[in-house]
Amino acid sequence: MILEHVLVLSAYLFFIGLYGLITSRNMVRALMCLELILNAVNMNFVTFSDFFDNSQLKGDIFCIFVIAIAAAEAAIGLAIVSSIYRNRKSTRINQSTLLNK
């Protein structure tokens, strides 16, 4: 695959995730957009690793670490959202003032 096509696709994914993260009012949607941003970054790691240094797997291994950290982040984030929903009955970002009290 051509490098420019993959980079354009990754940039689209990154900016869709960034737009969703900025405009989202739901916590679950914000977590999904954050995961989309991390996947776009992972796509760049794998692409540059394959394009520039095909003999070593540095980008691929770094991508595996990022996926593991993103999975832990998603689990912790969903646990926090679940706890906030149990207490407040809402997952809207602008309605959660749990830390202010």
UniProtKB/Swiss-Prot annotation:
Positions of transmembrane segments: 2-22, 32-52, 61-81
InterPro entries recorded: NADH_UbQ_OxRdtase_chain4L/K (IPR001133), NUOK/Mnh_C1-like (IPR039428)
Enzyme type, top EC level: translocase
Pfam family of the protein (one): Oxidored_q2
Key words, A-Z: Chloroplast, Membrane, NAD, NADP, Plastid, Plastoquinone, Quinone, Thylakoid, Translocase, Transmembrane, Transmembrane helix, Transport
NCBIfam families in the cross-refs: PRK05715.1-2, PRK05715.1-4
Membrane topology: Multi-pass membrane protein
Summary of the function given for this chain in its UniProt record: NDH shuttles electrons from NAD(P)H:plastoquinone, via FMN and iron-sulfur (Fe-S) centers, to quinones in the photosynthetic chain and possibly in a chloroplast respiratory chain. The immediate electron acceptor for the enzyme in this species is believed to be plastoquinone. Couples the redox reaction to proton translocation, and thus conserves the redox energy in a proton gradient.
GO molecular function, one term: oxidoreductase activity, acting on NAD(P)H, quinone or similar compound as acceptor
Annotated PANTHER family: NADH-UBIQUINONE OXIDOREDUCTASE CHAIN 4L, NADH-UBIQUINONE OXIDOREDUCTASE SUBUNIT ND4L
EC number: 7.1.1.-
Assembly with partners or alone: NDH is composed of at least 16 different subunits, 5 of which are encoded in the nucleus.
Localization terms from the record: Plastid, Chloroplast thylakoid membrane
Principal cellular location given in the protein's record: plastid
Any one Gene Ontology BP term: ATP synthesis coupled electron transport
Similarity comment: family membership: Belongs to the complex I subunit 4L family.
Organism: Aethionema cordifolium (Lebanon stonecress)
GO cellular component, one term: NADH dehydrogenase complex
Reactions it catalyzes: a plastoquinone + NADH + (n+1) H(+)(in) = a plastoquinol + NAD(+) + n H(+)(out); a plastoquinone + NADPH + (n+1) H(+)(in) = a plastoquinol + NADP(+) + n H(+)(out)
Stated name of the protein: NAD(P)H-quinone oxidoreductase subunit 4L, chloroplastic
